């Protein structure tokens, strides 16, 4: 099967979040299964700086962005049997960053038009065109309304994945003529209109053959007003084409037996190295070295979405327990201040690292006993899967991908891979932590069983990609 991904970012070239991870991993896994896979993304200045000497110039052409006649350079690089095509235009993409400019609408309108015209020019007409988030959300609409005259495009099936429903691409309707070069009929009849704006994401939901998001629970949640960010009505209307597929993690890179960032390696069969990592981290961060004290790890952006309001409300309470806690991350200033204050007040219990450090992050996953992640909402979440891979049991709020990936401890049969609570409040976070501490302190065999079960879970992309493969096959 020929599959083309179009996205605004992709690891290792340009990455700001989870979308970049998916584009770096899913095409590679599909290629391993024998599919012919290509990725189209912008050629940013940071791509040129890091990979410019490896990337070949393929061709160039011009495209019309409304009245503008714009240059489209095409560059190419093959990696892991996936061909990456880069759209090169320094005016649009040499900004020192991926997103956040006043003209993002124009930048990504240009990118979508260039990507669609590129397919014919490189003679790669995919069976499935898989687009991601609002930056590429007009492609399914353009495929059917603007480029339908290209006969080769008529059998292409479009899949749209929502990674972040908060950013929907809402613009003035004049953009249809001014940038995309199409009439306003579909806006005037209400198809593309939402809240009196042109809504790119709504267009993708209506015009795609399938819509996916990054976990089954989140797919259900975005059909509700609480999580749908204003698009819940459209999600309910189009529920028949909506499904959720949990993202994977790179299990080759994230491997406690080989991770280069760890001073000691370990496996689910031999956790001796995990204890040594704990002692090493305690020494490194100036905490008292004690292999028996439960160590709670947090690696996260410090925001309300990640549940830091309820963590902050209970932090004094938590630090009365016989625990140690290590926090790594940056975010809202008041949370940074709160954790720094409590770290100075309880220097033997709390280490607050208000920065981001990949090496330290891996060491926290490997050293901690409990990984705290009580997100208010979480479309998928990768940290809880990484924690389980390293034998750190997640303590999570049952929402989105957290609900789908963490099995709550069952005290009757010992099953589970972590601890969870349903009602989003500091009280239930604290009660769940007390349960986890009780199991850790009083039932060591039950704890070891939970660690074994967590480390046995397969969250690899090779497994996650099977669900995408089945989805694509349903469209043929």
From Swiss-Prot:
Q: Name one GO biological process term.
A: glycogen biosynthetic process
Tell me what reaction this enzyme catalyses. [(1->4)-alpha-D-glucosyl](n) + ADP-alpha-D-glucose = [(1->4)-alpha-D-glucosyl](n+1) + ADP + H(+)
Q: In which pathway does it act?
A: Glycan biosynthesis; glycogen biosynthesis
Its EC number(s): 2.4.1.21
Name of the top EC class for this enzyme? transferase
Could you say which residues bind ADP-alpha-D-glucose here? Answer: 15
Q: Does the keyword Protein transport apply?
A: no
A Pfam match: Glyco_transf_5
Q: Which SUPFAM superfamilies match?
A: UDP-Glycosyltransferase/glycogen phosphorylase
Which keywords belong to this entry? Answer: Glycogen biosynthesis, Glycosyltransferase, Transferase
- Signal peptide feature range: none
Q: Name one GO molecular function term.
A: alpha-1,4-glucan glucosyltransferase (UDP-glucose donor) activity
What InterPro entries has UniProt attached to this entry? Glyco_trans_1, GS/SS, Starch_synth_cat_dom
What's the superkingdom here? Bacteria
| Assigned protein family | Belongs to the glycosyltransferase 1 family. Bacterial/plant glycogen synthase subfamily.
Function statement: Synthesizes alpha-1,4-glucan chains using ADP-glucose.
Per its UniProt record, what HAMAP family does this chain match?
Answer: Glycogen_synth (MF_00484)
Q: What name does the UniProt record give this protein? A: Glycogen synthase
